[in-house]
Every structure is written in C-alpha cells, then in structure tokens.
Curated annotation (Swiss-Prot):
GO terms for biological process: translation. NCBIfam families: L9. It comes from the Bacteria. Transmembrane segments: none annotated. Binds to the 23S rRNA. The lineage of its organism: Bacteria, Pseudomonadati, Pseudomonadota, Betaproteobacteria, Burkholderiales. InterPro entries: Ribosomal_bL9 (IPR000244), Ribosomal_bL9/RNase_H1_N (IPR009027), Ribosomal_bL9_bac/chp (IPR020594), Ribosomal_bL9_C (IPR020069), Ribosomal_bL9_C_sf (IPR036791), Ribosomal_bL9_N (IPR020070), Ribosomal_bL9_N_sf (IPR036935). Belongs to the bacterial ribosomal protein bL9 family. This is Large ribosomal subunit protein bL9. One of its GO terms (molecular function) is structural constituent of ribosome. It holds the Pfam family Ribosomal_L9_N. Keywords: Ribonucleoprotein, Ribosomal protein, RNA-binding, rRNA-binding.
C-alpha cells in the first residue's frame, strides 16, 4: 500500500514522503495513529495544501523536545530498593519506576519514552538510561540504585 507520511517515522521516512508499506502496518498502526494517509490523488493534493502547516507543527514539536532535552540532560535519579548483601535487588527497577521519579522532579514523561538497554536494572549501582523525547532527540540520564537492607 502506498502512503503519505504525515510525521517522521523511524526506519521508514520523513514528513511528506510517499512510501510503500505492508497493508497491515498501514491499516493497523500508521493510519490510526495519524502518522500516515493513503496516497490517493485527492490525499496528495490535500497534503500539498497543508504541507507548510504540518512542517511548522513538526518543527515546533522538535523545538519543544530539544528544550526539554536540555533541561533533562545530565539529570541524576536516586532510587532505593531492597537488596541482598551481594548487591542484587529483590525485584528490579523498571522504566515505570524511572518515569515515576522523573515525573516527581517535574518532567512529564510516559514510561514508553524510557529505554533500558539491558532490560530492568537488577543490581545496585549507577546505570545510564536513554530517554527518547522525539525521534531526533535522545537524552542520557544516570540512574543510581541504592540497596536498603531490612
């Protein structure tokens, strides 16, 4: 299926590109989330009429993400979990825990924006976590996990 991208999509293309994707990907994900439209002649003409407006919104979204990224860059989070003597946690620290702590500090982030490179954190210590604010803005945050013994 031929579609027109209304937003930048990772590994697919940028705003305004006409790309061919599998029908299910277009019907079930791209079109319902508002990232694409079917590439009919009418849709192409309508897109060209709204192109400047869409590019302006994309630019403002990127600027907002960059501004939030500058505030978030270098932020350190301290979390405490119950841990054994050897430093292993009873349970783990997940992206939900990190998002909750960042929200307490005033950053409005969904847990889906936080990427844990090695899965949930299961050891005491410092870990680097990626926060994806936009497809072009990725910020590193340091998460310090401290163990508390009961």
């Amino acid at each position: 299926m031929q579609i027109i991208l209304l937003d930048k999509v990772v590994n697919l293309g940028n705003l305004g590109q006409i790309v061919k994707v599998k029908d299910g990907y277009a019907r079930n994900f791209l079109i319902p989330t508002g990232r694409a439209r079917r590439a009919t002649e009418a849709a192409k003409a309508e897109f060209e009429a709204k192109r400047a407006e869409l590019e302006k919104t994309a630019a403002t979204n990127l600027a907002q993400a960059q501004a939030q990224g500058e505030k978030l860059a270098g932020t350190a989070i301290k979390l405490t979990q119950k841990a054994g003597v050897d430093g292993r946690l009873f349970g783990s620290v997940t992206n939900h825990d990190i998002a909750e702590e960042l929200n307490k500090q005033g950053f409005k982030l969904a847990k889906s924006r936080i990427r844990l490179p090695n899965g949930p954190i299961k050891m005491v210590g410092d870990n680097t976590v990626s926060v994806v604010l936009h497809t072009d803005v990725v910020v590193e945050v340091i998460v310090s996990v401290y163990g508390e013994t009961a």
